[in-house]
């Protein structure tokens, strides 16, 4: 199966996350009723206020805004790093319910690609060998669909391409970017 390109799509997000964040912050620091707080937020841009609150280290207000992304063309290895961010929700393409008979997508690391065409050809040949092993195990396990996929998948490499739908609140997204970007 050919290599796929990476793709990240923002599929949903909190409407007006800045205003929602500002509401959370103003609720912490202001007296009065909710109607007055909402009116304050509607009347002026909240960016400077949110930045000031963030500079004070009050980041919990970011947790009210969330963002959901669909990520394709990434390796299972990347997935292992991504899911270390536990203040997030993940739905991952299953290697049990999705059969890779006929070919699995995989990621070629840039360092291997940089070694030149011979190294890259060797890598592709190794992926083809793993595909053959996978299909061989499926057959030995009785081509029983999900049941044989479940055990055959253990020979698939960390480079195996996957998809993930993930949702993070703004605070965790900011933390994620500080570590991973």
What are these regions (language model features)?
Residues 1-181:
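Family-specific signature for flavin-dependent thymidylate synthase
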């Amino acid at each position: 199966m050919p290599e796929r390109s990476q793709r990240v799509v923002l599929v949903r997000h909190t409407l007006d996350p800045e205003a929602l964040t500002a509401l959370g912050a103003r609720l912490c620091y202001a007296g009065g009723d909710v109607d007055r707080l909402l009116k304050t937020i509607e009347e002026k841009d909240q960016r400077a206020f949110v930045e000031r609150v963030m500079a004070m280290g009050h980041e919990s207000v970011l947790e009210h805004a969330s963002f959901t992304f669909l990520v394709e063309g990434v390796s299972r290895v990347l997935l292992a790093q991504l899911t270390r961010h536990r203040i997030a929700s993940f739905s991952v393409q299953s290697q049990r319910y999705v059969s890779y008979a006929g070919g699995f997508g995989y990621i070629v690391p840039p360092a291997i690609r940089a070694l030149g065409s011979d190294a890259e050809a060797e890598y592709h040949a190794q992926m083809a060998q793993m595909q053959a092993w996978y299909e061989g195990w499926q057959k030995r396990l009785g081509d029983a669909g999900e049941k044989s996929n479940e055990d055959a998948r253990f020979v698939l490499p960390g480079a195996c391409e996957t998809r993930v739908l993930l949702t993070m609140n703004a605070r965790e997204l900011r933390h994620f970017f500080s570590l991973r970007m």
